[in-house]
Design a protein with these regions (language model features):
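Helix-loop-beta segment of a Rossmann-like dinucleotide-binding subdomain
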Residues: 89-109, 113, 148-150, 243-247
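C-terminal helical "tail/cap" subdomain of flavin- and related membrane-associated enzymes
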Residues: 339-480
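N-terminal Rossmann-like FAD-binding beta1-loop-alpha1 element of flavoenzymes
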Residues: 1-30
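FAD/FMN-dependent oxidoreductases across multiple families
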Residues: 106, 250-337, 341-367
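Short beta-strand to alpha-helix junction loop
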Residues: 51-52, 99-118, 170, 176
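Predominantly flavin-linked oxidoreductase catalytic cores and closely associated redox partners
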Residues: 122-264
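N-terminal FAD cofactor-binding segment of flavoenzymes
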Residues: 14-18, 34-87
Length: 480
């Protein structure tokens, strides 16, 4: 295994469960004793918010109840389906058995990773070799196809050969091992699409005796030129994250500076209560992140593997915009799909073909849905800033969005249908094919906002583009 992040640790747990002996090579040093001071330099997005889906929670509860217990001991919390409902929807809420599955994990990425690492160590699931890089893949040949039979590592100037039956790439967005294979003449079939979004995140800590603000849905506001959200984590920590478009100079400049960032947040009704100085205090700087893209990598071309004994998990094989919260969950689920395949056959060709087929059957439709949403998001930004005129289709889509928003707030059945897809228990787009859900949305739209008017108006309240410029001028910060 190369990489001891969420994907690598998940793969170690899964592979050990099917009888494999596992070694993990990790380029970062051992974690700091205190999670608050652990800086995961090899994973720059570790400081960004991570939505940990109900599907991931179910995996932990089903296969690793001891890990889940350790997470709870570390202060990791849970947020139940009913907790996301608006008070109006709660008056109409009739619980269903499956609602328990729609409980999410509230944790910092670093808390989750450190706890998983302790769990792996406590249960002797893998040997972790820290502060070590892989500078070469050992290649042989089997029936005319390159075969990875180990790695050459380097630790503080000292090299070491580690032979292995299989090598698993969990290096994430760095694509480190894919580049090593490419340099050896082994190319993958890669679908790649850039993401035009930048993340700017600041961490906060609740003051003693304070609680998170009451909310409905994911706390935040969505506009065509930006998205902002607050996400609870463990031990009273939470993030506020502003997502802006890469070529939006004003908002990018505003997001980089704590003074303008917080002034902007104070003018957004869904976010202002979270950063109230009486409720919470900032615990660090603003962290920017722009290494975001969509990627689908395959080593099987026209039914034939291009490489044997080599598999990729997590962001090394499938990537999407982190706002959809797929990263950690898909990494863990994909690792277990791989372990199932490895346990079922020793044929290296069948292993890769079956693994990639399982990935496609499990994740491909949602990946395509997210990519379509991403392209729509980019178009809407161009319309919002006046670069592209809105068509009749664009206006109709915006109208549908408003109708859906009202139903998500007021109707537990609609929220359940959408939330099930968001948490990985149905396809993300499954609700769009359900007549009963559309009937509820249409019925709600015919009633009109009514008692939702105040909330809808709040969610639409924001600084105008001219007010954004005024915020920058007030703090003598100029976009360029």
């Amino acid at each position: 295994m190369v990489g001891a992040g969420i994907a690598g640790l998940s793969a170690a747990m899964a592979m050990r469960a099917v009888g494999c002996r596992v070694a993990i090579v990790e380029r970062d040093p051992e974690p700091a004793p205190d999670v608050d001071h652990w800086r995961r330099s090899g994973v720059p997005h570790a400081v960004q918010p991570h939505f940990l889906m109900g599907r991931l929670r179910s995996l932990f509860l089903d296969r690793y109840p001891g890990l889940f217990a350790m997470l709870r001991e570390e202060g990791v919390d849970e947020i139940a389906f009913a907790d996301y409902l608006h008070p109006l929807a709660r008056t109409r809420y009739v619980p269903k058995r499956e609602d328990a599955l729609l409980t999410v994990i509230a944790s910092r990425r670093t808390t989750l990773e450190r706890t998983m690492r302790r769990f792996v160590h406590r249960n002797s699931m893998a040997t972790i070799i820290p502060h070590t890089t892989v500078n070469k893949l050992l290649l042989a040949e089997r029936e005319g196809t390159p075969y990875v039979c180990g790695v050459e590592t380097r630790t503080e100037g000292s090299s070491r050969i580690i032979p292995s039956e299989i090598v698993i790439d969990a290096t994430g967005r760095t694509d480190a091992l894919a580049r090593l294979l490419a340099s050896a003449g082994v190319e993958s079939n890669t679908e790649h699409f850039p993401c035009n979004i930048l993340y700017f995140t600041q961490w906060f800590r609740l003051r003693p005796g304070k609680t998170f603000p009451s909310t409905s849905g994911l706390p935040g506001q969505i506009f065509d030129d930006f998205v902002i959200g607050a996400l609870p984590a463990d031990n009273g920590r939470f993030t506020v994250t502003l997502q802006v478009h890469r070529d939006d100079t004003e908002l990018t400049t505003l997001a980089k500076h704590p003074e303008t960032f917080r002034e902007f947040c104070r003018r957004l009704p869904a976010i202002a209560p979270w950063i109230d100085p009486d409720r919470a205090e900032a615990t660090g700087p603003i962290y920017g992140f722009g290494m975001m893209d969509y990627l689908w990598r395959s080593w099987v071309v026209k039914g034939e593997p291009r490489i044997l004994g080599f598999f990729a998990v997590g962001d090394s094989v499938i990537r999407s915009n982190p706002r959809f919260g797929r990263g950690c969950t898909w990494a863990a689920l994909g690792a277990h799909l791989l372990a199932d395949v490895v346990a079922a056959t020793r044929d290296p060709r069948l292993r890769l073909v079956r693994y990639e087929k399982k990935l496609r059957n499990t994740f491909r439709k949602d990946w395509m849905t997210m990519l379509a949403i991403e392209r729509t998001t980019q178009r809407r930004f161009q319309i919002a800033v006046g670069h592209t005129p809105a068509t009749l289709r664009d206006r109709f889509a915006s109208l549908l969005d408003r109708c859906l928003l009202e139903s998500l707030i007021a109707d537990p059945a609609v929220f359940r249908a959408v939330w099930s897809g968001y948490n990985g228990f149905a396809r993300m787009s499954s609700w769009t094919t359900r007549f009963d859900i559309w009937a509820r949305i249409i019925k709600r739209s015919m009633v009109g906002p009514g008692e939702l008017s105040n909330l809808i108006n709040q969610l639409r309240t924001r600084p105008s583009r001219s007010e954004i410029g005024e915020i920058l001028d007030r703090f003598a910060i100029f976009s360029s």
